Regions:
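Short, contiguous alpha-helical
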Residues: 1-12, 16, 52-98, 139-178
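A short, mixed-charge helix-start or loop-turn motif at secondary-structure junctions
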Residues: 22-26, 103-110, 147-151
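A generic "alpha-helical surface" signal
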Residues: 27-34, 64, 68, 111, ...
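Acidic/histidine-rich alpha-helical segments that form the ligand environment
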Residues: 31-43, 100-138
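Generic serine detector
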Residues: 35, 45-48, 73, 112-113, ...
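Amphipathic, soluble alpha-helical interaction motifs
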Residues: 39, 43-46, 50, 80, ...
Length: 178
C-alpha cells in the first residue's frame, strides 16, 4: 500500500496566513475554536483503549497523545492570548511539545484532557467574544520565531490547529474502518 505521509501529517494542508485577515475570518476562526471540544469529543469518545493507543500515522503520536497535546497546546495559546491582552507585546515562553507528549500525563485516560479542553475552550470563547476588532491587533513576541505576532493571526492558527488534529483522528478512523 502506498501511503502519502505528507497527507497523513497535514490532511487539511499546512497553516497559511492570509494576506489580509478580515474580521469575518476572525469570527469564523472563533466559531471553530468554540466548537472544537464537541467535535473532538465526538471523534474520540467511541474509541477503545487499543484504538486510542494507535498512532494516527507511521511515526506519529497516538490518538491519546494527540488529545493530551491539544489540551497542552491550547492552554498555552489561551495563556498567551491573556498575556497579549493585558501586557504590551509580552515575550511568550516557548515549550517543547514533543517532550511534553512524552511526559507521564500523556498516558492518562483522555477524559482528563477532554475536560480541560471543554472548560478552557469555554473560557477562551468568552474572552474571544468579548474582544473588539482592534484587540486582535495586539501582539506577543515569540522568541523562537524572533518576531511579534498579532492575535488575529493566532486565532486563525489555532482554528487551523483544532481542525488539523481533528482531521488526524477522523482520517485514522476512516482508514481503519472503525
Amino acid at each position: 500500500m502506498n501511503i502519502d505521509i505528507e497527507f497523513l501529517k497535514y490532511p487539511i494542508g499546512k497553516f497559511q496566513k492570509p494576506a489580509t485577515i478580515t474580521y469575518d475570518l476572525i469570527q469564523e476562526a472563533i466559531a471553530v475554536i468554540k466548537s472544537f471540544p464537541a467535535h473532538i469529543f465526538t471523534a474520540v469518545s467511541p474509541l477503545s483503549v487499543v484504538q486510542l493507543d494507535t498512532p494516527y500515522r507511521p511515526g506519529g503520536w497516538t490518538v491519546r497523545q494527540l488529545v493530551h497535546h491539544c489540551a497542552d497546546s491550547h492552554m498555552n495559546a489561551f495563556t498567551r492570548f491573556k498575556l497579549a491582552l493585558t501586557e504590551e507585546n509580552p515575550t511568550i515562553k516557548p515549550y517543547d511539545e514533543a517532550a511534553w507528549a512524552r511526559l507521564a500525563d500523556a498516558d492518562l485516560p483522555i477524559e482528563s484532557s477532554l475536560a480541560i479542553i471543554t472548560a478552557m475552550h469555554l473560557k477562551w470563547g468568552v474572552v474571544l467574544d468579548s474582544m473588539k476588532e482592534e484587540d486582535f491587533k495586539k501582539t506577543y513576541f515569540h522568541p523562537e520565531k524572533k518576531h511579534s505576532q498579532e492575535l488575529a493571526e493566532i486565532v486563525l492558527l489555532y482554528a487551523w490547529h483544532s481542525r488539523h488534529h481533528l482531521s488526524h483522528v477522523q482520517h485514522l478512523i476512516l482508514r481503519e474502518k472503525w
